[in-house]
Design a protein with these regions (language model features):
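Small beta-barrel nucleic-acid-binding modules, primarily SNase/OB-fold domains
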Residues: 1-207
């Protein structure tokens, strides 16, 4: 289990979500500056220090891409999976009838609209956010597609809200467990998913 923590202070454009934008509910673009990133190898005992590890850095995984592009990073919300607006079932292969086509999964629109409407309660088009992820080194934060993995927190009506948790608790995302997650993080997502399932079953008149 990772002991360090990476913290990213940035801004989130509410308009990136459907219907105005194309972001899925579990993938968020965050606006950043050169001083947005800070890291502590032991948050309980050592202060966070600004890190420049991502400036002009290239991430190599399924493809090569810049970690920061046009002052933006892509966050894959840790521990959750939401249905997609533009899902591609397979890699392009010669002879496939639906080669290259993208499909909209059930509730893909609803999940991202609900997230949009919730974030819009801030009354602003662009709102401050904080991304947190537990890693031993800053460069451990990426997935194979070059996205940052972490939790996003925003402030709505004076209250800090973890968007990963909010999506699961309200039934708009499923639990998806990562090797990088601690037992505490896994248990939190699991409890929220059980709460959501119990509430939805009750809403549909099921025991």
């Amino acid at each position: 289990m990772a002991k360090g923590q990476l913290r990213v202070s940035g801004q989130m454009d509410v308009g990136q979500f459907w219907p105005a934008g194309q972001s899925d509910a579990d993938t968020v673009t965050v606006l950043v500056t050169a001083n947005s990133f800070s890291f502590s190898p032991d948050p309980a005992n050592k202060p966070f220090k600004t890190t420049k590890a991502f400036q002009n850095a290239t991430v190599r995984g399924a493809s090569s891409r810049l970690a920061i592009r046009n002052n933006k990073i892509t966050i894959r919300l840790q521990g959750i999976d939401a249905t997609e607006l533009h899902y591609s079932a397979t890699l392009p292969k010669k002879g496939l009838i639906d080669n290259g086509k993208r499909f909209r999964q059930f509730f893909g629109e609803t999940a991202t609209v609900k997230l949009h409407d919730f974030a819009a309660q801030s009354g602003k088009g662009i709102i401050g956010c904080e991304v947190l992820t537990s890693v031993d080194h800053p460069n451990d934060v990426f997935d194979t597609f070059g996205s940052f993995i972490g939790d996003i927190q925003i402030t709505i009506k004076g209250k800090k809200v973890n968007l990963n948790h909010w999506l699961v608790q309200n039934g708009w995302a499923f639990p998806t467990y990562y090797n990088s997650m601690s037992p505490v993080e896994i248990n939190a997502i699991q409890q929220l998913s059980e709460f959501a399932r119990a509430r939805l079953r009750k809403a549909f008149g099921r025991n």
